[in-house]
């Protein structure tokens, strides 16, 4: 069921994107995910994340995994035809300014989003990366239709903060969205012949600190939570892949579209 909008949100120019259908996870894929377990296969040690820069694919591109260093991981791979690194950076700089932007990403599960760094996000003297690096988003989302939405705070940092090699980043043609924890995650977008592909990783039991990546106490690998997270990630990023090229072309130079001066965000 779609998130209910306020009257002001219904008047938002982005409403046409809200009206677009959001596809469920394909039946065969959903059935495959529901059979997955963290015990099925070994993932990657966090220290090996710079292998993401290598050509080709790793054995752990999609599914639930136990890692050799003791943690666990959820991984997803999303084809994004027509999407570029510039679009993806723009999206993470732009969408945190207004809840309606977050809702159209996944209108069934996304309820609220507000960057805590509005001036930084609106600062046109900064690059798109600089407009979301070292910022915090307050969000409210559900991971499935039968779950209640819960609040969370997401911090976005430069990828080297979570262990990516600064030298490799200099020549990388894609982009990496990095969140240091308490659930350490990153979205590694790299170019393809028809656009980009997104390699998402969620590491349970890890956190980025001033002293580097540390292992932290974590609940035992929960297969049900892992499957729910993967299903949600498949749905939301598949939909973003569909709408992002048009959104970017229409609003890439408009960071204030639909912003309500009365604060109905």
PLM segments and residue spans:
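Terminal "cap-and-tail" regions of soluble proteins that handle hydrophobic small molecules
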Residues: 2-68, 192-265
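Glycine-rich portal/gate segments that line the openings of hydrophobic small-molecule binding cavities
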Residues: 107-180
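Hydrophobic/aromatic beta-strand elements that line small-molecule binding cavities or substrate pockets
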Residues: 77-78, 183-191, 201-204
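Amphipathic alpha-helical segments
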Residues: 81-102
